[in-house]
Structures are given as C-alpha cells and as structure tokens.
C-alpha cells in the first residue's frame, strides 16, 4: 500500500484561502464553517502563512487515545475520523499536540482534515491541492514528497516543519522563517517506536473508559430528552 503526503511551500502561499473554500464545498460543512470550524484554513501573519490542518502523524496521539476508535490511521497515512463512532468526549482535542481537532458543541462531533481519503482512493489529489492557484500545495507518495521537501529546503535555505515533529507527519511545511514564529505549534521531535494502524486493538483500560463514557453519553441524552419533554408539557399547560 502506498503512503501519501502533502507538501506545503509557505513561500508560494498568498493566503487566498482557496484551499479552505474548496474544502468546504467538497465536504459540505458550511454550517460548521459559519461557526469558525474548518478542516483547513490559512491565517495570515507577518512572518508567514499558517495553514491549520491535520498533520496526519506517523504515530497520532488522537488515534492511540480515542476510547471508541472513532479515529484510525489508514495504511496510506491519513488519520481518519468516523463521526458515527464518536461520542464527543473530546479526548482527541486534548491529546493532539498540534491542536488540530475542533469540537462542534452543537453536533457533539469534531472537525478535522482527512486528506481527502475518498478522493485519494479514486486516484485524485486532495481538493485543496487541486485548487491551489500558486502551486503552494503539492501531493504525492510519501518518500517523493519528503525528498522534494529536503531538496527545496537545501536549495532555498528553508525550514522544514513536520518531518520530525511528534515522530514525523504526512504534511511537510517549507518556510523562510521558523514555522513556530507564525502559528505552527512547537512540538518536540521524537523517534517512532511503533506505527499506529487501523488494525491496532483497544487496550483494556481504554475499553473500560469507552464503556464508562458511552454510559455517560446515554445518561446525558436521556436527561436532555426528559428535560425537553417537561418543557414541552409546561408550555402546553
């Protein structure tokens, strides 16, 4: 199975947010975007353009800690999210070192990039890469993108972000200035001892936590339903 990666050359990004608009259209999350929740978005800063998106870590903390396995890592390298399994516990929000997952309080779900796994599976590029007008975003096989990032970095004296942070990611950012100076989170570099995959099983403590949280969710839903019924009854009286 081929692994893929995205290469973002910040020196070509003009902050037009075509990537964000195209992403909204692709996944039809206009309501969430209206609340300021995005799968990807570019913030313009003096030192560079900070593009907030999932970094698709080699060993994602969100996947390792999700109690119900709503987050998994595909063999292609993407960190995927299953909203049907999600119980809204926000563990991923707390555990992500890159501060990526955003919680939709109304839907009780999270919002994050999937690297357009559905498009990649069809042989297409992610929507954001396809629409980028300046070529700031590139997509390809992991080793190819990594090699290209190193080559461009050496040639133009650019910083590389995402190659070693948190043990490595599937998103490489090239920038003239230190990426952490214009929005990217400072994350410690570390070696990967074990890759997390979709076949990884849930540990016993995690399974127990899943049952507990699941019970709490049912209790909360029942309480909300009862309160709604009581309010409806009072309004009729």
Language model region names:
Residues 1-237:
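Non-ligating segments of multi-cofactor redox enzymes
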């Amino acid at each position: 199975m081929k692994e893929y990666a995205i290469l973002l050359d910040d020196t070509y990004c003009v902050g037009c947010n075509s990537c964000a608009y195209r992403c909204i259209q692709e996944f039809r999350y206009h309501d969430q975007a209206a609340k300021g929740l995005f799968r990807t978005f570019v913030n313009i800063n003096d030192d560079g353009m900070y593009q907030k998106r999932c970094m698709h870590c080699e060993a994602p903390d969100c996947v390792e800690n999700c109690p119900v396995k709503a987050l998994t890592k595909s063999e292609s390298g993407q960190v995927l999210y299953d909203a049907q399994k999600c119980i809204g516990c926000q563990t991923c929000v707390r555990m992500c070192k890159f501060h990526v997952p955003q919680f939709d309080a109304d839907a009780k779900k999270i919002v994050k990039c999937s690297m357009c796994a559905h498009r990649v599976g069809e042989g297409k590029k992610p929507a954001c890469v396809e629409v980028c007008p300046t070529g700031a975003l590139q997509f390809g096989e992991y080793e190819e993108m990594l090699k290209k990032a190193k080559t461009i970095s050496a040639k133009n004296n650019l910083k590389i972000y995402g190659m070693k942070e948190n043990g490595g990611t599937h998103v490489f950012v090239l920038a003239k200035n230190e990426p952490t100076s214009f929005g990217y989170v400072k994350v410690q570099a570390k070696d990967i001892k074990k890759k997390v995959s979709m076949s990884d099983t849930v540990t016993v403590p995690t399974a127990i936590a899943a049952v507990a949280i699941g019970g709490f969710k049912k209790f909360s839903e029942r309480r909300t339903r009862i309160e709604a019924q009581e309010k409806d009854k009072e309004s009729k009286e």
